[in-house]
């Protein structure tokens, strides 16, 4: 049998997850489909920019390594 400590921890985590899920659903109900479309477009632009900046960072790093090796 599990100790009481582990049981109460599981119940607390389950209650917390249920509460978070409830409030997430409440928030989702307040956003209209057109707002979701705008959120999707803006999110795509942000992730595209982050991808570009990450690629730029590693290209600069690669160029510096090549310059240090004399290539």
Swiss-Prot record:
4Fe-4S among keywords: no
GO MF entry, a single one: pore-forming activity
Top-rank lineage group of the source organism: Bacteria
Residue ranges of the TM segments: none
Gene Ontology terms describing biological process: symbiont-mediated killing of host cell
Alphabetic keyword roster: Cytolysis, Host cell lysis by virus, Viral release from host cell
InterPro entries: Lysis_S
Family the entry assigns: Belongs to the lambda phage S protein family.
Protein name (database record): Prophage lysis protein S homolog EssQ
Biological source species: Escherichia coli (strain K12)
Upper classification of the organism: Bacteria, Pseudomonadati, Pseudomonadota, Gammaproteobacteria, Enterobacterales
């Amino acid at each position: 049998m599990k100790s009481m400590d582990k049981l109460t921890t599981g119940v607390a985590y389950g209650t917390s997850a249920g509460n978070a899920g409830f409030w997430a659903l409440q928030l989702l109900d307040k956003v209209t489909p057109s707002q979701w479309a705008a959120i999707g477009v803006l999110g795509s632009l942000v992730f595209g920019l982050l991808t570009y900046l990450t690629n730029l960072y590693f290209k600069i790093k690669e160029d510096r390594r090549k310059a240090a090796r004399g290539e």
